[in-house]
Amino acid sequence: MKLKKLFSLATAALSVGVLAACGSSSSSSSSDSSATTVRVGVMSLSDSEQARWDKVQKILGDEVKLEFTQFTDYSQPNKAVAENEVDINAFQHYNFLNNWNQENGEDLVAIADTYIAPIRLYSGTADGKNKYTKVEEIPDGAEIAVPNDPTNESRALYLLQAAGLIKVGVSGTELATIADITENKKNLKITELDASQTASSLSSVDAAVVNNTFVLEAGLDYKNALYKEQKDENSKQWYNLIAARSDWEKSEQVAAIKKIIEAYHTDEVKKVIEETSDGMDEPVW
């Protein structure tokens, strides 16, 4: 799998587009040789995510340097933490982490909550225009794409249930699969795709559930979504987090990692999230 090493955010803010294209790598431009470097695994960074990590780096100053590795699919960031290729990662919610640990026999842990990113159902397109403007317009026999990894597929199915399109026979804290659908009055065809492909499928399906990670890079406007995930008693499992190895407090980077958490959990970063995500992400600390 192709990895793209990014400059730490001190320099990335100036040239992130170029770096993403050419896969260059570097560390922070800080001149303090005593600074501790912490390697952070992420997925594609939206402008808002870039801005909040820029703010974290600014708060940290020269004490800690953030060095980012950008991954192209969800299967890799946790493996990179487990194999000590990065020190921490920030890309997933609790449900995904718990499921990944079970499937891979690992014990990565959440060390900080960050935000919740409500997923949305988007209309398919035809001739460059949305086919539908509301859920009720989705016709009988329509095809709806959902992510195929267990946790995001489950989340997508619960979203479709909340939107009134299907019913599933399990509770909101259990992983739902297509086999758990107990009611499908419109005879919808639910198509499983890699999460990175759901947005690009909109030209060939009637609707798709798209994770926020891929919304902006696909040129989608979340304000045009047919349905938005609502907060309820089951929302905690969808909180995004910073993850590390279970022995992270014994590592040489422990003090630096704690400073990163403290920097992230400031009103300054909260303000950046609120001002730059335009409602796509909501702080949860």
Language-model-detected regions and their locations in the chain:
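C-terminal motif of bacterial Sec signal peptides marking the signal peptidase cleavage site
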Residues: 17-21
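Bacterial signal peptide processing site
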Residues: 23-25
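Flexible hinge/capping segments at coil-to-helix
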Residues: 30-36, 123-144
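Short, polar/charged alpha-helical segment
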Residues: 37-38, 42-69, 76, 80
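Short helix-initiation/N-cap motifs at beta->coil->alpha
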Residues: 68-79, 172-200
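Ligand-binding "clamshell"
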Residues: 99-111, 126-128, 204, 209, ...
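A bilobed periplasmic-binding-protein/Venus flytrap-type ligand-binding module shared by bacterial periplasmic
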Residues: 118-134, 238-254
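Periplasmic-binding protein-like
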Residues: 154-161, 262-284
